[in-house]
């Protein structure tokens, strides 16, 4: 703006340039460099346009940070766009006002039954999986609606963070966890032998859930003694991302019915999360592309 002050209405320089530069605390070199560069097109404009196109693909994409935006650009390879480093992508995002800063995180809701029999912690915080349907995590979260609370239960595959089982209800009984497991087994019959890790909530230590685990030949894993939240950090992270991307600053959930909440959550997980969303916490974001291809066959 200081450089603009040195120009007349017709755009020509007027007066003693050296004097004006001293008054405005700018250098003559900087001023003349501004004159040379001001009419040149911004070299990152094609990149900025490509990033805006990515955000426009889905309403939830506006939560993309530097990493996922960089990965999206690398996957899509937009025409006539030279993809720079991730750091430069971040600078351009800041410049055009689309950088994302994470906000709130949800708290866990399940309560441990100290008297119930527990299963061993088979994962020991190692959420890395070389193949699909070998390591999974499960948990529940709650969302307040105008007619009560909606409880969402899901099973996530550690390989690519995809949702393989999903169920929702207005109660958080063990039957909800059992339904989630049954939905996963129906959709993925080869889940037999997989490890499914959970916290020590009464739903997961119940006889009903244990019988379902045995029925489908699944290995049950639970948080270590003491119920440390980090033992199931992967699942807690999924809920945090879902609420940040889908709910926070978009919907006033307490003015929505539980049926309305069910609709947007089903759509989010089945249409967006499992098909189009880039998850930077996976082994490699290219695994998500492979999963998309499989789902569309």
Model-assigned labels for residue ranges:
Residues 22-25, 140-173, 182-185:
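Short conserved beta-strand segments at catalytic cores or DNA/RNA-binding microdomains
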Residues 28-34, 85-94:
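Major-groove recognition helix of helix-turn-helix-like DNA-binding domains
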Residues 286-295:
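Conserved small/polar residues in nucleotide/adenosyl-binding loops
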Residues 17-22, 69:
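Short alpha-helical "recognition helix" segments of helix-turn-helix
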Residues 109-112, 198-200, 206-210, 222-244, ...:
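RNase H-like two-metal-ion nuclease catalytic core shared by retroviral integrases
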Residues 217-221, 234-258, 266-279:
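Active-site proximal helix-loop segment of RNase H-like, two-metal nucleases, encompassing DDE(D)
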Residues 83, 90-154, 178-180, 187-193:
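Mobile-element integrase/transposase regions
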Residues 1-12, 41-88:
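A short, amphipathic alpha-helix used for macromolecular contacts
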